[in-house]
Amino acid sequence: VARPVIFVLAGVNGAGKSTAGERELTQAGLTWFNPDTFTRQLIKTTGAPPAEANAAAWQAGVRQLDAAIAGRTDYAFETTLGGNTIAAKLREASKTHDVLMWFVGLGSPEHHLARIKLRVSRGGHDIPETKVRERFESSRRNLIALLPYLSQLQVYDNSVDATIGQPMP
């Protein structure tokens, strides 16, 4: 009997997680929880301030992950992997699930910050510089600590920028 799967699309803000993973996951028939998308929906439907909507989206994602672990069901989600909560839950999930991760990274915090600045110039959301710098280190520490618990890991260096509409380098 196949074990249920927890699929994790991880990486620091601005790494290109959504861009790199959305098409592949959708083509594979997976619906996944993207906290940024959920935050935008909450702001639009409830008028909640961005910080409040972001916190609610994060909590919703954690509840869904908890439900998938408890119910032994498949779940796919996106995370920065910057904090301790998700890493602990993935260790727990590995007891009953195959935990598969795609980790999308860039070579420096400065590159993440430049990508975020570009995203903001196009109407996207900003992330404080201190958070990006913290997550650059903590996400890698969490990734290394999770290695024994992952059934599969693919790491993507997304440092080469591509022009929209052009083939990926």
Residue positions per predicted region:
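Phosphate-binding P-loop
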Residues: V1-P4, A68-I69
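Glycine-rich phosphate-binding loop used to anchor ATP phosphates in small-molecule kinases
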Residues: A56-V104, S139, L146, Q154
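Conserved substrate/cofactor phosphate-moiety recognition/catalytic segment
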Residues: T19-T73
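NTP-dependent small-molecule kinase module
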Residues: A145-P169
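A glycine- and Lys/Arg-enriched "phosphate-lid" helix/loop adjacent to the NTP-binding pocket
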Residues: T96-N142
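P-loop (Walker A) phosphate-binding loop of NTP-binding proteins
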Residues: V12
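Conserved glycine(s) of the Walker
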Residues: G16
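Short hydrophobic/aromatic beta-strand immediately N-terminal to the Walker A/P-loop
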Residues: I6-V8
